[in-house]
Amino acid sequence: MSDSTVAASASASASSSAKSSLSDLRQFRINKNASSVVASPSRTERVPGKKRIQVMADSDSDGNDSQTPKKTKLELTVKEKEERYMAAAKISPHFDTMAIQESLSRTNWDVAASVRYLRENCKPKGHNGPLAKSKLKPRSNGISGGNFSDNDHSDDDDVKQSKDQVYDSDDSDSEMSTKMTGQRKKVFQFMNEASLIELQSVKTLSEKKALAIIDVRPFSDWSDLRQKLESIRMSGDLLNYAQELINKQNTVAAILSKCNNMVSRLEKAISNGAGIVEQPKLLSSGLQLADYQIIGLNWLTVMHKQEMNGILADEMGLGKTIQVIAFLAYLKENGLSQAAHLIVVPSSTLDNWEAEISRWCPELVVEKYHGSQDERRRMRGRFAKDGFTGFDVLLTTYHIVGSTPEERKMFRVCKLDYVIFDEAHMLKNMTTQRYANLITINARMRILLTGTPLQNNLLELISLLCFVMPKFFAKSIEDIKSLFAKKGKSDGDQDEVSQFQETQIQRAKRIMKPFVLRRLKKDVLKNLPKKLSLVEKVPMSSQQKIYYHELVDYYSNNKGEVCSSSERAGIAIMMEMRRIANHPLLMRHYFTDANLRGFSKRLANASSFKKTNEQYIFEELAVMSDFQVYQMMNKHEFYDVKIPDNLICDSGKFLYLDTLLPKLKAEGHRVLLFSQFTMMLDIVEEYLRIRKFGFCRLDGATAVNVRQDLITDFNGDDSIFVFLLSTKAGGVGINLTAADTCVIHDIDFNPYNDKQAEDRCHRMGQQRPVTIYRLISESTIEEGILMAAEEKLKLEKDITSNEKGEVHEQRCVVKLLTTALGLDKDQEEQLNNSLNNSIASPAK
């Protein structure tokens, strides 16, 4: 590619930096002048002491069999990839981060090819014109190819949009025409008729500016519009921003039209008898799918016949796993599988998936890709030689599928039929490295399973939809994100705000409809035992109250530190308050500095402790909580260091459990107790030992090969009264219906995590009514967290929150601390700015 070709294809917005950009690009094109960041293509760097598996052909290659070993390709280090990304970003600054990353991945990190791909296939930010057609061969990883009908392709030609802006600052006053055509007419109509909230959707338009525009309406013609904008000191660029918004709305309208067409096609296929599948004969004869599961199977078969990917979003506990197993059995029974299938699951559900497949369909041959690095290396060697053959299903975890460059390469290259993602809400953020890795898996079709498709905001749902149907949404993703990120901010006409939000809701529902199947337990499980949810506001113990109020008083009297200190800003302060609200031993009050000096001396002389400098050891102990100090000393066999039992049992929540647990045990109930914090679970363990209750425990540190044994033991052994679980590790994908009581010791900021946790026992197979206890420390920051969680739960019903998740979390923290510490408005704003700076400039 010549320099002139590059210059010709560059966007107008990048022309001012063309010379430096071409210089940056040239170093990647001409080997003899290449920058040192580019390794010579004649050799492949190897990490000393590590062997490479046989390299597999990339799916971009021209060969027919992507599993055939090919010549070794250039392998770049992470640093080299970062440098190439920076070079591409510098050359193409007007393209989205994800678009640049995807283009580099598609072109094997060739910067010149990546830049060409961007300019031919992707829209720069704010660009609305047509794009040149790409000459690159598409990859068969689900991003292009047979995941839906060609009639559904989201080409830019579908929405005719003008490349010319409606306002040009070089136009003279005499050139202002009263005659309007095309885009000007649409912008003029919008500026005359848009509501306050609609005007606020235009870039740079605040509520104050939008009100000023409404005050000078109506506009008689184009020149009147421009003159009145000038009279209220608003730039004509505002008209271009309005044009940009209208074009985005047109793009989304085109997508909605396509979605409606897809719904019509699906309905026609169903009415013509597509689907109508009964329980596959390959399923175990003694097991029977529920009626709604048969419907789910038929939905999957219709989607398969229409070559459409989908999201099975049944509420937690409705047996999504079983429906997928039945679908895979249907494919095998009818000879429809074109290759092996991949199922990607959280570590905690790996063994459960294997057990359920064996139980429901023993005919499906399962290969579990798991184990040590050496074991996986040997398996990769076999896959490199034979491909994914000899089995129907390859089962692995989210962690392992992207664990090493070799594994990412393997799943990008080897062909798969279906890839199924369990707990797919893990893909809700399209900016993460995990999302970028998983979207390159080379599968013909995709199915996502999630019981909570909506958690924080609409954009998370859009991330899932873009993952499941990438080509359908890819070229419009920035427009979709922009529109769904808008939120009605007016404090005025609430009917107007509600109408704006209702429009967003209806858009989201129409986009979702072809791709998502969601049923609720209350609608399909008529015989499921009832669930009673109780919020128990528990008073703190007397000493706990003293500690909590001391902390609040300290920060209330040092508001400057709260609002400005980067080290002890918002979240850290809130966490200290949460710790004391849960248990005093999560902070340090019992062990004095003098105690720590003595402990430091003993540890320095201990053969099992590596450090010998007493001062360093003291400083390390000084930042620990009482319980951490106790654990440290016991770890190194100083068993004389103890915390009295009365202090371990001294928290408001434990005092409540002193009444609740004996009553539950006497009545024959069994309990799941969840906490977000493993340190809190450590203290609960000590409490249960003191109270002589039998228990077992599962958290993120529990070995994967042990987890299923723990679940089996609890379900089969009535003597185990309490199962301790961390909310994240133990709250997804496991069946614990032997319990009928769930205690949420400390609630999560994200209430959907708690809902997942409680559904471990309230699900298919439960025979008894279920009771959920949420413990909230009275008059503490936990009451504010509960209110924030209840607001988020409205998403599931209304789909109304359209803010970015990170910003929403930050505002929650600011609001909670403002209330807890009595900050005034200026201090609240200062804290908000401090958190903004902290997020923008994280510590290195």
UniProtKB/Swiss-Prot annotation:
Top-level enzyme category: hydrolase
Sequence ranges of Low complexity compositional bias: 1-23
Catalyzed chemical reaction(s): ATP + H2O = ADP + phosphate + H(+)
UniProt KW keywords: ATP-binding, Chromatin regulator, DNA damage, DNA repair, DNA-binding, Helicase, Hydrolase, Nucleotide-binding, Nucleus, Phosphoprotein
Primary localization class, coarse: nucleus
Domain (Helicase C-terminal) ranges: 656-818
Modified residues (Phosphoserine): 834, 838, 841
Gene Ontology BP terms: defense response to Gram-negative bacterium; DNA double-strand break processing; positive regulation of innate immune response; positive regulation of transcription by RNA polymerase II
Top-level taxonomic group: Eukaryota
Keyword Chloroplast: no
Residues spanned by motif DEGH box: 422-425
Catalytic activity, EC: 3.6.4.12
Ranges annotated as biased composition (Polar residues): 30-42
Domain Helicase ATP-binding: residue ranges: 301-471
Cellular component GO terms held in the UniProt record: chromatin; nucleus
Compartments it resides in: Nucleus
Gene Ontology molecular function: ATP binding; ATP hydrolysis activity; chromatin binding; DNA binding; helicase activity; nucleosome array spacer activity
SUPFAM superfamilies: P-loop containing nucleoside triphosphate hydrolases
Ranges where the record places region Disordered: 1-75, 121-180
Positions contributing to ATP binding: 314-321
Entry function: DNA helicase that possesses intrinsic ATP-dependent nucleosome-remodeling activity and is both required for DNA repair and heterochromatin organization. Promotes DNA end resection of double-strand breaks (DSBs) following DNA damage: probably acts by weakening histone DNA interactions in nucleosomes flanking DSBs.
Family, per entry: Belongs to the SNF2/RAD54 helicase family.
Protein name: SWI/SNF-related matrix-associated actin-dependent regulator of chromatin subfamily A containing DEAD/H box 1 homolog
Gene encoding the protein: Etl1
